Design a protein with these regions (language model features):
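Active-site-adjacent beta->alpha loops and helix N-cap segments on the catalytic face
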Residues: 30, 79-88, 146-150, 194-214, ...
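Catalytic cores of alpha/beta
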Residues: 60-63, 234-243, 282-300, 340, ...
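Short beta-strand/loop segments at the ligand-binding rim of alpha/beta enzyme cores
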Residues: 43-50, 97-101, 216-226, 267-282, ...
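Alpha/beta catalytic cores of nucleotide-metabolism and tRNA/nucleoside-modifying enzymes
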Residues: 1-24, 104-105, 176, 226, ...
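Terminal amphipathic helices with adjacent charged low-complexity linkers/tails
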Residues: 76-91, 127, 131-147, 188-205, ...
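Catalytic beta/alpha-barrel core
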Residues: 73-77, 103-104, 124-126, 164-166, ...
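Bateman/CBS regulatory modules and CBS-like beta-alpha motifs in cytosolic regions of diverse proteins
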Residues: 28-44, 51-53, 82-122, 127-129, ...
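Glycine-rich phosphate-binding active-site loops on the catalytic face of alpha/beta enzymes
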Residues: 67-82, 191, 245-257, 296-314, ...
Length: 492
């Protein structure tokens, strides 16, 4: 019996081991379709997802990414209430119509209204009675010069008989009314005069500014949130569902495990219509196990991340390109999307991940340095940086991610934690939209070279194995770079 023949797979490949072979093309990069899916029931306009990491995704980045056409996954290193509030911020950031606007009663005070406006970052509040009958609206203009904070809202609001309202929530109709009436907020009421929603000119402008945004059926930005296998997991899911989260990501370092599937079944039993993405895995067998037990999406990647040390500390993992392919071969049988998580350094790696079978990619470090990512900037050697840490780092596990690495209960004693990640810094790189533009530009270019009109066609592209010399030849060489491009850095 040979150890090599019996127990060692022939080889595992990652992004730098291959290139895509160019093919005959009838499409230009600007003509290709980059729409895809995140889960069974959630479509994306670009194949990009942000990682559920505490130095990557909170509401600001999730909002920015959804406006570009992707989706963000809010991390869970916070209380249930805090995570639910992050989801709420995303869902309220942009609306065709606000279906559950913040309201106030006529007996509240000017001070109450100002506090509500400040807390929710809004400029107007419908005034309703106990039956939600619209009786007026109060805006920041009504309150701007009020000195008496105890004055009742009824005395300063614009009363219902002077309000312009509508029964038709169509945005084109609402825009016409807003323009003709020279107002900024349009209450939507039913036949009885009961408040149904609120349309603002600001929201209509956002719709026009971000035509590619990833939105739900009500015109709100989509967002997902991470959950783990913890005693309060179902309470967390309940709070997230109450805020209309679009999907939850059941996150673990080893998704091919009994406790993950047990939690998956519990979530699907209570919330059968909620999409649950599960990870991380690295084999086709793991994909089959999760899909058979109800997973609506599977996330691939054990150890490829720049801040992950799992492969070194635990000696476990599969090179990312091979892992994506093996999982995709199984997932395509049931139509479950595959998310390629980790190991990406350049836009060309995104193209390779999609061609190997991924439906979308999850990005961490490339987004951690953006202004929308959590945390402020630091100055080091005269340059701006932002912090970036693996969820398996000691700091992240102390903050709440220990369960992801099956070490729940050890957070209070650092010496008992066995980290599988590090903390680092990444260069500050400006806004997210600039990065996404370059990444999607690279994806479009790669699809054009392969003659792929859409991502499904790209999955038929052929690869060629290359040597280290071939990769060296692929990078700029034999010159000193004097002006770096926005999508390439030799420091990566």
């Amino acid at each position: 019996m040979s150890f090599i023949n019996e127990r060692v797979q022939p080889e595992g490949l990652t992004f730098d081991d291959v290139l895509l072979i160019p093919a005959y093309s009838e499409v230009l990069p600007r003509e290709v379709n980059v729409q895809t899916r995140f889960s069974r029931n959630i479509s994306l306009n670009i194949p990009i997802v942000s990682a559920a990491m505490d130095t990557v995704t909170e509401a600001p980045l999730a909002i920015a990414l959804a406006r570009e056409g992707g989706i963000g996954v809010i991390h869970k290193n916070m209380t249930i209430a805090e995570q639910a509030a992050q989801v709420r911020k995303v869902k309220r950031a942009e609306n065709g119509m606000i279906y559950d606007p913040v309201t106030i009663s006529k007996d509240h005070t000017v001070g109450d209204a100002l506090n509500l406006m400040k807390e929710n970052k809004i400029g107007g509040i419908p005034v309703v009675d106990a039956d939600r009958m619209l009786i007026g609206i109060v805006t920041n203009r009504d309150l701007r010069f009020q000195r008496d904070m105890s004055r009742r809202i009824e005395e300063v609001m614009t009363p219902g008989d002077r309000l312009v309202t509508t029964h038709n929530p169509e945005l084109s109709h609402a825009q016409e009314i807003l323009l003709n009436s020279k107002i900024e907020k349009l209450p939507v009421v039913d036949d009885a005069g009961r408040l149904v929603g609120l349309i603002t000119y600001k929201d209509i402008t956002k719709v026009q500014d971000h035509p590619n945004a990833c939105k739900d059926a009500k015109g709100r930005l989509r967002v997902a949130a991470g959950v783990g296998v913890t005693p309060d997991a179902m309470d967390r899911v309940k709070a997230l569902v109450a805020e209309d989260v679009d999907a939850v990501v059941l996150d673990s370092a080893h998704g091919h495990s009994a406790n993950i599937v047990s939690m998956l079944k519990r979530i699907k039993e209570v919330y059968p219509s909620l999409d649950v993405v599960v990870g991380n895995i690295a084999t086709g067998g793991a994909a089959r196990y999760l899909i058979e037990n109800g997973a609506d999406g599977v996330k691939v990647g054990i150890g490829p991340g720049s801040i992950c040390t799992t492969r070194i500390i635990a000696g476990v993992g599969v090179p990312q390109l091979t892992a994506i392919y093996d999982v995709a071969c199984v997932a395509r049988e049931s139509g479950v999307p595959v998310i390629a998580d980790g190991g990406l350094r350049y836009s060309g790696d995104l193209v390779k991940a999609l061609a190997a079978g991924g439906d979308c990619v999850m990005i961490g470090w490339m987004f951690a340095g953006r202004e929308e990512a959590p945390g402020g900037t630091i100055i080091f050697n005269g340059r701006k940086f932002k912090s970036y840490r693996g969820m398996g780092s000691i700091d992240a596990m102390k903050a709440g991610s220990a369960d992801r690495y099956f070490q729940k209960g050890c957070e209070g004693n650092i010496s008992k934690l066995v980290p599988e990640g590090i903390a680092a810094r990444v260069p500050f790189k400006g806004s997210l939209s600039e990065t996404v533009y370059q990444l999607i530009g690279g994806v479009r270019s790669g699809m054009g070279y392969c003659g792929a009109k859409d991502i499904e066609t790209l999955k038929q592209a052929r690869f060629i194995r290359i040597t280290a010399s071939g990769m060296q030849e692929s990078h700029p060489h034999d010159v000193a770079i004097t002006s770096e491009a926005p999508n390439y850095s030799s420091e990566r």
